[in-house]
UniProtKB/Swiss-Prot annotation:
Membrane topology summary: Multi-pass membrane protein
Catalytic activity annotation: reduced [plastocyanin] + hnu + oxidized [2Fe-2S]-[ferredoxin] = oxidized [plastocyanin] + reduced [2Fe-2S]-[ferredoxin]
Taxon lineage: Bacteria, Bacillati, Cyanobacteriota, Cyanophyceae, Nostocales
GO MF terms, alphabetically ordered: 4 iron, 4 sulfur cluster binding; chlorophyll binding; electron transfer activity; magnesium ion binding; oxidoreductase activity
Annotated GO biological process: photosynthesis
Name of the protein: Photosystem I P700 chlorophyll a apoprotein A1
Length: 752
């Protein structure tokens, strides 16, 4: 940390705006394509509508003025936040108006969550299944009831108020988006002042946000949940404001409150140990993390981030400068190191977005795993349908975000990369030895593909020939995941040793006891064996192929031996012009397109693995003697060793419910299962046929229309190659995801 001389204090945190830079014009809004000179002329061919959608949010094509682009993105963020808060408000309103939340709250072990009742128009009311407690509706698997219980919400009136609050917030965000584009628009200098932005995001949003949440957890959630756990009737539990206003109510539950704020300033923090705990493990009543542990966690996070928010140099000449940190970051093998990255990040929002998407996508996948290993909300762990669905949901989201990160990194390379700024820095050096990177990665993919798949092929062959003693399995030739087992073991031994104050392990997935709630397993040690070793290497294979495709698109975005001037062709182009055969499907966009399919492969294997492994080795019932009966009876270790086992004992065996769902409350999933298969198959029509085929067909149809004097004024055109592939991949992913959704839901919901 340095104190800088006055001439270096170039980044004063000032509020710098332009007043009324862009008039609010409804006439402009009413003109489709007003942002593009060609589109504004109106449609001549049907391609116009596709280009309109492709370019509406591509602000780079509207203007080259970085300040205007920055303002548009900033305003769009407020619009996005408005949509999110509106959507959440709708969810919470459903909970208030159409749900059995209060019935569920009084008996979460036997009443299932439902927040939608179908109206009987053509017999759809068959979908309103009996969810217990005399309520009929569609069972939901979003985990919202469990979250609300964790928040401390005890009645539907509180949900109504929260829903209205969400609407108000959405209105404020919409106003803010309009205001900061049309009335008071920040100057480019404000957007590029990274130190001030870090201070605000770290200290205010993350730090104070976590601190506020810790306050809510301590003063409202923890006492409410403690009373609910003790079996106190909902109507006898004090309302949130009563806990806040009446200290006596809190002191009864947590005596540490009696000493007030004094122990904080006298550093006698042990006084607070009853509501800021470090227990580890799960609450045996609810199967969720201890709310007092969660409070402690958020308080610690708040302290860290509030300190972090004070580390960067703004108005007072002390603290770090991001540019200096980056430019001093040199190693013996990295040339100019991170020099130039500051300029990349502050002049290219694509570069900034790419890193954010990669981080956020990875974080989302980490969240997916924490949700079952350390279930944060009460009664989440024993709601198997919700557990399966939120895992699947977070995995898909994470996959899409990571591919988006690669997409925007590639757009940065094409549109924003400046070779003058990036001379012998890490980015330049990576690009210059891209051949070594890609060829090695390709070798890794081939190795993993042949070996991981080869193990399964061997096992299928041995089983087919009746030679089980020659298979790779826990009972024949063992391939134990010894490193994973070692990691599990050190985590199990941590309480009392490396984590001296923890009472239980961080997660029972590593080891320890079985936590059962109401006779159902919430979490227990997940034993790993040969079958896990095999599928782990399939994961490694699919992830590495996804990375290969996306990284190749990024590293060869500007040029390649095949097309040296690729940067001039843009992010998406079909081929390198006429007379250059073999140059199709090489654009940055095409790599993202291919990467999406491999992302789909990767995530599909992960969610299938999770679904079967949990049903086989974790989820199930516990009798009075402590014996566990798993849903699929522990068949993972022997069945998941062969491809045939995956097809027969997972896909086929567990599709029974969706295939036989007609005439039951789950019949919508049967229809969705078929419908989504059709959407998926429809995608193949776009992916397997060429543009010329369709253009010929269209011209024949136009001829017939001309004969009948009904030819349209807007000339029909076949989709371009890129448009066709975009429609294809969209339907492929939509169809595949919805098929999986119906398959998982019908199976897991039918198990109760």
């Amino acid at each position: 940390m340095t104190i800088s001389p006055p001439e270096r204090e170039e980044k004063k945190a000032r509020v710098i705006v332009d007043n009324d830079p862009v008039p609010t014009s409804f006439e402009l809004w009413a003109k489709p394509g007003h942002f593009d000179r060609t589109l504004a002329r109106g449609p001549k061919t049907t391609t116009w509508i596709w280009n309109l959608h492709a370019l509406a949010h591509d602000f780079d094509t509207h203007t080259s003025d970085l300040e205007d682009i920055s303002r548009k993105i900033f305003a769009a963020h407020f619009g996005h936040l408005a949509v999110v808060t509106l959507w959440l408000s709708g969810m919470i309103f459903h909970g208030a108006r159409f749900s059995n939340y209060e019935a569920w709250l009084s008996d979460p072990l036997h009443v299932k969550p439902s927040a939608q009742v179908v109206w009987p128009i053509v017999g759809q009311d068959i979908l309103n299944g009996d969810v217990g407690g005399g309520f009929h509706g569609i069972q939901i698997t979003s985990g919202l009831f469990q979250i609300w219980r964790g928040w401390g919400i005890t009645n539907s009136f509180q949900l109504y108020v929260t829903a209205i609050g969400g609407l108000v917030l959405a209105g404020l965000f919409l106003f803010a988006g309009w205001f900061h584009y049309h009335k008071r628009a920040p100057k480019l200098e404000w957007f590029q002042n990274v130190e001030s932005m870090l201070n605000h995001h770290l200290a205010v949003l993350l730090g104070c946000g976590s601190l506020g949440w810790a306050g809510h957890l301590i003063h409202v959630s923890a006492p409410t949940n403690k009373l609910l756990d003790a079996g106190v009737s909902v109507k006898d539990i004090p309302l949130p404001h009563e806990f806040i206003l009446n200290k006596g109510l809190l002191t009864e539950l947590y005596p540490g409150f009696a000493s007030g704020i004094t122990p904080f300033f006298t550093l006698n923090w042990g006084q607070y140990a009853d509501f800021l705990t470090f227990k580890g493990g799960l609450n045996p009543v609810t199967g969720g993390l201890w709310l007092t542990d969660i409070s402690h966690h958020h308080l610690a996070i708040a302290v860290l981030f509030i300190i972090a928010g004070h580390m960067y140099r703004t108005n007072w000449g002390i603290g770090h400068s991001i540019k200096e940190i980056l430019e001093n970051h040199k190693g013996p093998f990295t040339g100019e190191g991170h020099k130039g990255l500051y300029e990349n990040m502050t002049t290219s929002w694509h570069a900034q977005l790419a890193t954010n998407l990669a981080f956020l996508g990875s974080l989302t996948i980490i969240v997916a795993h924490h949700m079952y290993a350390m279930p944060p909300y009460p009664y989440l762990a024993t709601d198997y349908a919700t557990q399966l669905c939120i895992f699947t949901h977070h995995m898909w989201i994470g996959g899409f975000l990571i591919v988006g990160g690669a997409a925007h990194a590639t757009i940065f390379m094409v549109r924003d990369y400046d070779p003058v700024v990036n001379q012998n820095n890490v980015l330049d050096r990576v690009i210059r030895h891209r051949d070594a990177i890609i060829s090695h990665l390709n070798w890794v993919c081939i190795f993993l593909g042949f070996h991981s798949f080869g193990l399964y092929v061997h096992n299928d062959t041995m089983r087919a020939l009746g030679r089980p003693q020659d298979m790779f399995s826990d009972t024949a030739i063992q391939l134990q995941p010894v490193f994973a087992q070692w990691v599990q073991n050190i985590h199990t031994l941590a309480p009392g040793s490396t984590a001296p104050n923890a009472l239980e392990p961080a997660s029972y997935a590593f080891g320890g006891g079985i936590v059962a709630v109401g006779g159902k397993v919430a979490m227990m040690p997940i034993a790993l064996g040969t079958a896990d070793f095999l599928v782990h290497h399939i994961h490694a294979f699919t992830i590495h192929v996804t990375v290969l495709i996306l990284l190749k698109g990024f590293l060869f975005a500007r040029n390649s031996r095949l097309i040296p001037d690729k940067a001039n062709l843009g992010f998406r182009f079909p081929c390198d012009g006429p007379g250059r055969g073999g140059t199709c499907q090489v654009s940055g966009w095409d790599h993202v397109f291919l990467g999406l399919f491999w992302m789909y492969n990767s995530i599909s294997i992960v969610i299938f693995h999770f679904s079967w492994k949990m049903q086989s080795d974790v989820w199930g019932t516990v009798d009075a003697a402590g014996n566990v009966t798993h849903i699929t009876g522990g068949n993972w270790a022997q069945s998941a060793l062969t491809i045939n086992g995956w097809l027969r004992d997972f896909l086929w065996a567990q599709s029974v419910q969706v295939i036989n769902s007609y005439g039951s409350a789950l019949s919508a999933y049967g229809l969705m299962f078929l419908g989504a298969h059709f959407i998926w198959a429809f995608s193949l029509m776009f992916l397997f046929s060429g543009r010329g085929y369709w253009q010929e067909l269209i011209e024949s149809i136009v001829w017939a229309h001309n004969k009948l004097k009904v030819a349209p004024a807007i000339q029909p055109r076949a989709l371009s190659i890129i448009q066709g592939r975009a429609v294809g991949v969209a339907h492929y992913l939509l169809g595949g995801i919805a098929t999986t959704w119906a398959f998982f839901h019908a199976h897991i919901l039918s198990l109760g």
